[in-house]
Amino acid sequence: MKNFKIRQETKEDLDEVYQLIKTAFETAKVKDGDEQDFAVKLREGKNFIPELSMVAETDGKLIGHIMMTQTPVLQSNGERYTALLVAPLSVQLEYRDLGVGSALMKEGLRLAAEMGYQAVF
């Protein structure tokens, strides 16, 4: 599927993103049931990076979402660095297996590299 665009999430998207995450995880094999609330908490936290919270959109409808947040990493040699965590990554059921999730990941990784991040988990 190529008829969608990826863009940064806006404040106007937040209610729709909340519902998208909730609905997408209803059919997930592994879920807690509160992934949408987890995303809200991440967005309110100090490790949130607005540029790395993106949506996939087609015909004015949000069909996918990805969020990456910072996390400190302590290496075995004692050195520390900042990496990124991907969570959540959501795609509406009817748009799965069409490349939406892959496109969100690719764009997220591209932007993360541009911003100087060297690791994403």
Predicted regions and their residues:
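Conserved N-terminal entry element of GNAT/NAT acetyltransferase domains
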Residues: 1-12
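A conserved beta-turn-beta hairpin within the catalytic core of GNAT-like acetyltransferases
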Residues: 72-86, 96
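Conserved acetyl-CoA-binding loop-helix of GNAT-fold acetyltransferases
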Residues: 86, 91, 97-110
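Conserved beta-strand segments that form the floor/walls of ligand-binding pockets within enzyme
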Residues: 55, 67, 85, 90, ...
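Active-site rim helix/loop that mediates acceptor-substrate recognition in acyltransferases
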Residues: 14, 18-19, 25, 29-67, ...
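Short coil/turn connectors at secondary-structure junctions
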Residues: 80-82, 100, 117-118
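Conserved GNAT acetyl-CoA-binding A-motif
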Residues: 105, 110-121
